[in-house]
Amino acid sequence: MNPNSKTQSDNALWRYWRGLGGWNLYFLAKFALLWFDYLNFHALPNLVFMAFLLMPIPSQRLHRWRHYLAIPIGIALFYHDTWLPGINSILSQGSQLAGFSAQYLLELINRFINWQMVGAAFVLLIAYLFVAQWVRVTVFTVAALVWLNIVNIAGPAVSLLPATSTASAGGANTPATSVPAAGDAAPADSLPPTSANLTAYLNQFYEREKGRVTAFPATLPADAQPFDLLVINICSLAWADMEAVNLQNHPLWSKMDIMFDSFNSATAYSGPAAIRLLRASCGQLSHHDLYQPVNQQCYLFDNLAKLGFKEQLMLDHSGVFGNFLKELREQGDMQAPLMSQAGIGNELTSFDGEPIYNDLELLTRWLDQQQKGGDGRTATFFNIIPLHDGNRFVGSSKSADYQPRAQKLFDQLNTFLDQLEKSGRKVVVVIVPEHGAALVGDKMQMSGLRDIPSPNITHTPVGIKLIGMKAPHQGSPLQIKTPSSYLALSELVSRLVDGKVFSESSVDWQALTQGLPQTPVISENDNAIVMQYQGKPYIRLNGGDWVPYPQ
């Protein structure tokens, strides 16, 4: 073969180097989003995609087909680079989406559109068209992506960009790192926050949690005092939500005897949250293990039933959506019959079109039933959803504002506590939200979206009020500032289970709450894990690498 003809052939091939053309805009948009932490950018797949677009192809027809093929690939890669829910998550939630009302779906679509970003994209388009007249933009695009791949060798590219902040995501309410109680040592977090070390820390955490359990007494003493335990499980309430609507100082919270300031709900969805609460007597499980059999001693209400407490169940909704009631039965072992909702009024309609019953009326009915039942021991689980996103007032097609709904709920609970005080019954009221409402979105997910269990969603206000005491608590609530979760609630209930605290002439509240189990802040949904490590939040999506949670 003639060497000259080979050289001419090679030169002819490289004459078909056409540049990125309009795909420059695709990558420039990604760079802009990455700079402001709106992407979970995967540098190498993007470099491979760029190489595919740049590869010289002599045939005009094949070149055209390459662009047709690149469109779905580019869309899929862009989606993969976002913080949006994974395909598995969307498929798993698909049946629930089908249950949403048409008005709520339209509202979610409208909320999803960020008009500021649409405007910024338009400006970027005009700027690109203007500059591309004189500048070969492909050169700068390739250089930028190659640079991102080079710096990514040392770790995720997103963590090396100037816009990234690793400040704690809980703001003023995020608990500081605390020294664990003796015999309750948490896994060490002294190693550098590499992806491997973070995964090892998570595995150590779950291994440790498997061995933690609340020790309830086998029997109650002869002088034990009967009382009612009422657990009020509120959907969509976090500290961040209360601050967003200025209700963090509502009188309800000042009535509490004990407040957990650093409680972690460990999940952002209702079913898993309720299961975790009903299984509070054992350490924190992974999301996968929530749906696996566990030892019977893990079930809080079963432990109480063995000591003579009658289990009771109340809902202010049907429990049909998302198979919520079914999960309570199967994974939470809550077998008590559902208290009747007949004759209870409703002012709210849920996001799926079903009625939400008046909570004060339900609680008043519960109190009447306890009074008629005498002084026996009862343990009641009450799940309520008036604060859920998409709920609307009866007769309206528009979602009701969160603030008036929260105000009314807090007022109703406040009124009910007054009713309990007047009733003369001995009652332990535990207010423990499932998760937050995500009223304020962040760079990872829009307002109302809870696919990622961010600190603002899982940092929930938990309060305990003891009613009917001979020596009631005086002054402001006792604050538990250490990182806590459901095991601490179970332990506290076990300390109160004999009811003697109601008849004592004085109560040492510090001793009552001393040494409660501490739990590191780790939250998990089906495809996302958010974890505090060395005082900073990190996130892992779909089993990938850990990256700092964008602020």
Residue ranges: model-predicted function:
Residues 1-174:
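Transmembrane and membrane-interface helices of multi-pass
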Residues 8-10, 426, 432-473:
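Histidine-centered active-site microenvironments of extracellular/periplasmic hydrolases
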Residues 158-393, 486, 491-510:
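Active-site-proximal alpha/beta segments of enzymes that process anionic O-linked groups
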Residues 279-286, 333, 396-401, 445-449, ...:
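Short glycine/proline- and charge-enriched loop/turn segments
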Residues 291-298, 399-407, 450-458, 470-493, ...:
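A short beta-strand-to-alpha-helix junction
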Residues 304-308, 416-426:
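A structural motif corresponding to the C-terminal end of an alpha-helix
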Residues 322, 366-411, 415, 438-449:
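Active-site His/acidic residue clusters
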Residues 497, 501-551:
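Phosphate/adenylate-binding glycine loop and adjacent helical scaffold
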